[in-house]
Amino acid sequence: DSLKILDRTVKFAKELQELTGGKVPVVGSFSIVHSDRERFFEDHSALLKKYLQHGVEITPQWLPPIAWYFGGSIGLNVMNQYKDVEYLRRHELGVCMDICHLILGRNYYNFSAGDIIDNLKNQIKHIHIADAAGIDGEGLAIGDGDPENIALIEQILHYDCLKVIEVWQGHLDNGAGFKKALVKLAEIYESQ
């Protein structure tokens, strides 16, 4: 059951926080809205606030319209559209902004990714950085995606929050993909 998994995760995060004295980010995601969107955000807001009262913040992740899992893909219909911004702001939910997911959503739904970043700037708590192309090409090396993505990546580099490089298979070959991403991100940052 999902709530039992969430309870165990929060308990573990709390133990890590007590051990380290620092906050432990817990990033989660949702898949499909089975009821109406307002009810979805009300229910999830209440759930996340309950865990926050126990000292652990769970931050929902911005999702792609088509998510790839080992073995296939699934269409997602929440936390990936411009209309979700209003709900996130109204319910004061923090967000893990996954840049490659945002790019895929921009390409699928035809919205301005920069506008979403601007509208959620006070709620972005955590950022995942990777490039993307088309509607389902996620986790690409920085610079290997759609050319207009570099401006979006530049925009988020100055946000004061935890950032994680999330290039697909970046850990292989002694972290070659992560190293390449760090070098490219440093070039982008220094060129501003």
Where do the PLM segments sit?
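Histidine-acidic metal/acid-base catalytic patches
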Residues: 3, 7-22, 46-47, 90-192
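Active-site acidic/histidine proton-transfer and metal-coordination neighborhood
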Residues: 1-94, 104
